[in-house]
Amino acid sequence: MRALSLHRDHAVDAASGLAFDEAMAQLAGLPELPQAHLRLYDYADHAVLVGRYQRLEDEVDLAMAIALGVTVNRRPTGGGAILMGADQLGVALAVPAGTFPTPRQGMSRFAQGVIAALASLGVKAEMRGKNDIEVAGKKIAGVGFCTSGDGLLFHASILADLDTDLLLSLLRIPLAKLAAHGTGAVEDRITTLAELGAGRAELEAALVASFCSQLGLGVVDGEGRDCLERRASVLAEQRYSSEAWLFAQGAAAAGELAVEVRSSQGTLRIIAATQGDVIKSAVVAGDFNEVTPELRSLEEALRWSVLEPGALGRVLAAAPGVSGLAAPEELAAALCDAHFGRMALAGPRRIGSCYIPEEITL
């Protein structure tokens, strides 16, 4: 069915909310359902959602979340940790996988759809980096994507308003580092619809018009919802209510290296198991959007490599695509420094999250 089905939801819980989004992607393009699905919604106060490839323990103060009754879950899409609630507008668009030449090009088009909607309200926004939409240098939204089944899912979280004190209390990186400067340090880096004088209802209408125009589809209300809810109920129980999903990236075990470095695809956290001065295995986590061939090449190159800066640097330089992520000699030095105990975390540290534009500090 050549149509865009519009779904509106309010105060959803994290597990069912994420499951419905993924169900839209899995069923996008089925002949008996609309070709695309657009969902505009918000979460019950409050939920922290980490990105697909992040390590939960690095991003969220779990003890504080439990104390405050804040739900924690993991998105199917990449990117950084976000706080969702009544004051954050969630946008999910699901289309068949072949709609765009590549998923990354699809995310760019999706971001442009959000930017066009903001522009129709007189808000001039632009894309910055891999995930950020900014207004006058301040972040107003983050975007991400994933593939699921034969569909593509695009996520955006748009700030209608924000409780910066709550944000600071829940997110470990980088907000704990900014806490010494007070909430003003956060507020200087973000903006909201409320601050810009833009109405949420008007933006929702503009988003519908923008994506219908972009995809060349007419809108229908809630078509196929029963089918989506049946699929979502299974995903909510089997995936989004599972601790295995929540802690999917795992923590570094005793004796393993844990090194955080900046790369062209975002912040990478390399976790390596060693035997003597040799890396037995390595896993890369982080706020990237997808596991690319370059990231897989990095993991493969690290396996059974000797932790000596010169030798490891040469191995990484020879690995396909690794030099495009970060300087091989810097990666090698970071791992060797951590291994030999000179630094607990080596290399550039991230000052940034899903709602804080990234900076680099040495």
Region locations from a protein language model:
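Flexible, glycine/charged-enriched surface loops at secondary-structure junctions
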Residues: 37, 122-128, 204, 214-231, ...
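Beta-rich nucleic-acid/ligand-interaction surfaces
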Residues: 127-144, 225-236
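Structured beta-strand/loop patches that form or line metal/cofactor-binding pockets in enzymes
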Residues: 228-276
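Active-site- and interface-proximal helix/loop "cap" or "latch" segments in soluble metabolic
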Residues: 190, 273-355, 360-362
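N-terminal lobe of the biotin/lipoate ligase/transferase fold
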Residues: 1-105
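Contiguous, small/hydrophobic- and glycine-enriched helical/loop subdomains that border
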Residues: 86-131
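A structural signal for small-residue-enriched, beta-sheet-centric alpha/beta enzyme cores
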Residues: 139-200, 269, 281
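A conserved active-site cap/scaffold subdomain adjacent to cofactor or substrate pockets
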Residues: 182-222, 232-237
